[in-house]
A protein has these predicted regions:
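N-terminal nucleotide/polyanion-binding subdomain common to many enzyme families
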Residues: 15-90
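S-adenosyl-L-methionine/SAH cofactor-binding core of RNA-modifying enzymes
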Residues: 76-124
Length: 124
């Protein structure tokens, strides 16, 4: 019995879930609803869930940033809201990978993309 590509994708390839934590999740919606990512979502290959870091912010104003340690220009993301969000997500399911984005991190390339494609649940 021959199966369609849609059937194979839906029933034999496990769905991947990517949770993205962002200070501005609305800015992420548009690029994630077009092109290859849109088709992957429509075919049930990937589920992408955006999380607003401000929901985990500190104090009355839900603060997620702080001044740079040691002075200097700019702001940095506080660790408490990030850890609170990640811990909540980890309580809901098992994650294969948690990726912390930083300016001096590893370059995302095809090799990294291939390795991540083998993971089922990822937090970025």
């Amino acid at each position: 019995m021959a199966h369609s590509t849609e059937w194979i994708i839906r029933y034999l390839i496990p769905m991947h879930r990517i949770d993205i934590i962002s200070v501005q999740p609305k800015l992420m919606e548009s690029p994630l609803n077009h092109s290859i990512v849109k088709r992957a979502k429509e075919k049930g290959i990937v589920e992408i869930v955006l999380h607003d870091l401000k929901q985990y912010g500190l104090g009355k104003y839900k603060q997620v940033d702080d001044t740079v340690y040691g002075g200097g220009a700019g702001m940095v993301i506080r660790c408490e809201p990030v850890f609170d969000c990640i811990n909540k997500l980890k309580a809901e399911r098992d994650y294969d990978e948690v990726i912390y984005m930083c300016p001096d991190g590893e370059v995302y390339n095809q090799r990294e993309a291939n390795q991540l494609s083998l993971k089922k649940n990822i937090i970025i």
